[in-house]
Amino acid sequence: AALFIGIAPGYISRSVAGSYDNEAIAIFLLLFTFYLWVRSVRDGSMLFGMLTALSYFYMVAAWGGYVFITNMIPLHALVLVLMGRFSERLYVAYSSFYAIGTLASMQIPFVGFQPVRTSEHMAALGVFGLLQLIALTETVRRYVSSAQFKVLVRASVAILALAAFAALVALTYAGYIAPWTGRFYSLWDTSYAKKHIPIIASVSEHQPPAWSTYFLDLH
């Protein structure tokens, strides 16, 4: 992947040191944040979790594409949980990253309260809550019998899931949480921007490239 991205003209033109565009620093920060995240999960280090948050904060200040990190790291954490790989290391890494990173990102003027008031950021908040619930469950497991634990978990999960879903729907309809933006709908329907947001569709980087572009870029 590094080889291909290193010789792609579209990437080189935007990421060269001293470039005028945001991507000159943002692409590096994007990859560096993911690197620090992997280190924090591997080591279970709060220090690396904090460094991940600081790198994320710099990314937020540099480029609006920070939302990609905001959703990819929670997705990775969720996949680990679904695979049965929840651990104290994951809990420490994600909790330190999310708490510090979110508070830091809210200091950027154009972001403000978006991390708690837009649908684009709800996945990160949801995974944070899920990890707290799992950690609490693991603690309770030590003090109750197996039968009581199963009943308690099933009841708690059902109630909390319904409550969280109802709260999300209610707050969205009430206008407290903004709906998904057009660029996210464009991920599922590539013609969405062309139909509904012409100004976004007019930007060349938002248009799907022709297959010949991949061949020409690498020759």
Name each model-derived stretch.
Residues A1-L82, Y94-V111:
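Membrane-embedded helix bundles of polyisoprenyl
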Residues W63, I100-P115, L162-P179:
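Membrane-lumen/periplasm interface segments of specific transmembrane helices
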Residues S146-W211:
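Aromatic-rich transmembrane-lumenal/periplasmic boundary elements in polytopic membrane proteins
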Residues S212-H219:
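Membrane-interface anchor segments at the N-terminal boundary of transmembrane helices
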